[in-house]
Structures are given as C-alpha cells and as structure tokens.
Curated annotation (Swiss-Prot):
SUPFAM superfamilies: Prokaryotic type KH domain (KH-domain type II). It is found in: Cytoplasm. HAMAP family: KhpA. GO terms for cellular component: cytoplasm. The lineage of its organism: Bacteria, Bacillati, Actinomycetota, Actinomycetes, Mycobacteriales. This is RNA-binding protein KhpA. Gene3D superfamilies: 3.30.300.20. A probable RNA-binding protein. PANTHER family: RNA-BINDING PROTEIN KHPA, UPF0109 PROTEIN SCO5592. Keywords: Cytoplasm, RNA-binding. Residues 33-80 form the KH domain.
Length: 80
C-alpha cells in the first residue's frame, strides 16, 4: 500500500511543478508513524504548497483516501 501512495503523490506532484526531474518522494517510517516527504526544486515549492495551502491539503486528502489515516505528508523546504 505504501508504494502506491508514494507513486501517486509523485505522479501528481510531477504534473504540477516546472522541474519534474527534481521531484523526489520518500516514505519515512518513525516512532511518530509514516510520513510521505515531498522534495521539489526550490522554485516549485510555492506551487506544491499552493495558495493558502490548498494544494498541500489536496495532497494530504489524496494520501488519506489511498492509504488511510495515519500517513502524514510533509513538503520539505530544500533551501535550508
């Protein structure tokens, strides 16, 4: 199930950004649970988050629909 979630998020994010080759989606399993980390080119960060966080919220709803509750989605700021 987890690879389906990662593949779906990667497919959607690659369709949104201007630099699809710089997209990387990882599944991190820790004590806090499962987290899907989305890494994009710094110029595309705003597109993935969206106005008022709408795109990021839609990604979270997509993940909840595919993988069930308990999987977090984090858009990682690669500038830091």
């Amino acid at each position: 199930m987890s690879t389906v979630v990662v593949d779906a998020v990667e497919h959607v994010v690659r369709g949104i950004v201007d630099n699809p080759d710089d997209v990387r989606v990882d599944l991190v399993i820790s004590r806090r649970g499962r987290t899907v980390e989305v890494h994009v080119h710094p110029d595309d960060l705003g597109k993935v988050i969206g106005r008022g966080g709408r795109t990021a919220t839609a990604l979270r709803k997509l993940v909840a629909g595919i993988g069930g509750r308990g999987i977090r989605v984090d858009v990682v700021d690669t500038d830091q």
